[in-house]
Amino acid sequence: MKKFMVLYMASPADFEKAMKASPDQHKKGMDAWMKCTSKHKKSLVDGGGPLGKTKRVDAKGASNTKNGVGGYSIVQAQSHDAAAKMFGKDHPHLQMMPGAWIEIVEIMPMPDIVT
């Protein structure tokens, strides 16, 4: 089986708006998320979680930045297409924020390093 990193994406404005959801809306979203997680339990390697503030580090140092990544999971599947099929248009992340999207990136195996 191959492993894939799943990135739950949206604009920073959409994430800020989602954070203002009512307790009832939040519970409804979490219930849908847990149902989806249970459905794909056998494929879930790491349930991941929400992500916070971002630091960008380059040759000049570290600075605050924003990006569209709100959370992650790691799944396993036979193929990239099979992994993508786990995250259809009815996925809770896509339902909670109409402008949201999900990116699925294959995690490549690390070559053995000979010393």
Per-region residue spans from a language model:
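Conserved, structured core segments of small domains
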Residues: 1-115
